[in-house]
């Protein structure tokens, strides 16, 4: 990042978690992993939320769905330095950092919540998210 951005990992919220163990069949078919990231910004609190959504499926049957929201408080002077007019501009490095922290957290949540089930044998692999974020994201004050 060009300028140092100070932030604090404030909290996490498990928005959704569901398993469908009856759809799991032990065979040589690959498990498909889908993940996406969504961001929002609270201008009043200087808080950015990164939500990671993960879905695991096998042979077109959903095995697991999870959404984890992570909240990051951005230090006021850092937040001001990222504002352009009334908008907040999140650089790609910051988006990648928050996505990486959230994805790592959801990996742990999935492991912990599937303990004692057949799905615990499925380890969500690491994901280098840096290449997903090449441009800044603009958040408009509403």
Predicted features and spans:
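N-terminal intrinsically disordered, cationic/polar leader segments
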Residues: 1-101, 108-142
